[in-house]
Design a protein with these regions (language model features):
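Positively charged n-region of N-terminal signal peptides that target proteins for export
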Residues: 1-6
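Bacterial N-terminal signal peptides
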Residues: 8-18
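Low-complexity, acidic/polar, glycine-enriched regions of mature
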Residues: 23-194
Length: 194
């Protein structure tokens, strides 16, 4: 009997090492700003859909695939770095008529609820604070992958997400409705375990 225990216990210990991390524990991640993109797009007088992006997002993500309702995300966007890829428009965006970055240099999103929709899809409800105004926003997120990252050699997770906000909710409504009130958000991120 002792020999059986001596043989079995190490096997159980080794097997435990191969339990997927997502099943073993709630994971805490730090967003990688270099692999996180936040892109905004809108309708421009009906002719086109220009884009602007806010690079260098930072934040944290807590994820538990077995209890997704306990997951949460907290992100800060440096609005001072917004880039429309048109220098004159970028300058206008940073001014008082739009984001007023001198007074409001960053925006934040803090989740309040995560709802599993099946097939690695989640609705992430939360509060977006922009220009000192806080409004509820829902992001529709897809889990791309969770596991060890081959380059950084850490546990990692990746999501894509989309959502829509109204410019008028945040006093960014210049030229509405000729330029659309609705702004689509397209987000992609990688995050690494702390």
């Amino acid at each position: 009997m002792k020999d059986v225990k001596r043989f079995t216990l190490p096997l159980i210990a080794v097997a435990a090492l191969y339990i997927p991390v997502s099943q073993a524990e709630t994971m805490h991640y730090q967003l990688d700003p270099q692999h996180t993109s936040v892109v905004m797009s809108w309708e421009h007088f009906g002719f086109s859909h220009p884009t602007a992006d806010i690079p260098d997002a930072t934040g944290t993500l807590v994820f538990d695939s077995s209890k997704p309702e306990q997951s949460r995300v907290d992100v800060t966007l440096p609005v001072t770095k917004i880039d429309s890829h048109v220098p004159a428009l970028t300058k206008e965006f940073k001014g008082a008529d739009y984001f007023d970055v001198a007074k409001y240099p960053s925006a934040t999103f803090r989740s309040t609820k995560v709802i599993a929709k099946g097939d690695n899809k989640f609705d992430v409800e939360g509060n977006l604070t922009l220009k000192g105004i806080t409004k509820p926003v829902t992001l529709h997120a897809t889990l791309n992958k969770q596991g060890e990252h081959p380059m950084v050699k850490k546990q990692a997770i990746g999501f894509d997400a989309t959502g829509t906000i109204k410019r008028s909710d945040f006093k960014l409504d210049k030229y509405v409705p000729a330029v659309s009130d609705d702004v689509k958000l397209t987000i992609s991120t990688e995050a690494y375990a702390k």
